Amino acid sequence: MTVSAAALAAGAAPSYTGLSPLQETALKNRLAPPPITMLDKYVGDEFEPLYSTTVRVSGGEARHGRASGVARSDDGNLELALRLPAALGGPGGGTNPEQLFAAGFAACFHGALNLLATRAGIALDDATVDAAVTFGRDPVDGLYTLVAEIRIDLPRLPRATAEELIRNTERICPYAKMARQGIVCVVALVR
């Protein structure tokens, strides 16, 4: 950006010359983390919804959501082609449920990690979270299950501090809680 902070404060229009489209969008939208108040404890007897979304998957050419489906969110911000990975006998060329789950898990864990770090006065400018999700055979019922491994890189933190931060994050991250204790899931026929 070529406009100084003082000029911006005075009302000058910013110039986005030399920035990538992603950087430009981030600056235009003033992306910022959620408030630290997200960590305030809720006191109540029932689940209190804060945000809800719906994604619809249609079957596509093969009439099979996993093999040729399209996933669309109700707000239009997500539209993805779903394809069976080559490793499972499909053509690849699209995303799949495991990648979407891994992306959600990694993003949620990263967000919770940063909220806790901010509350503790720790800057995590270079933190990364990898979620490795594996689809495989379940020895319990002979069908299928998922296994997730979350790997966190906190290169600038002392090991003891990093380990404590990760332990605390695992306690509060909604995806980690879901993996550990299950989730309320209602399956219903609508038509």
List where the protein language model places each region.
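Extended beta-strand/beta-hairpin segments
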Residues: 2-103, 110-191
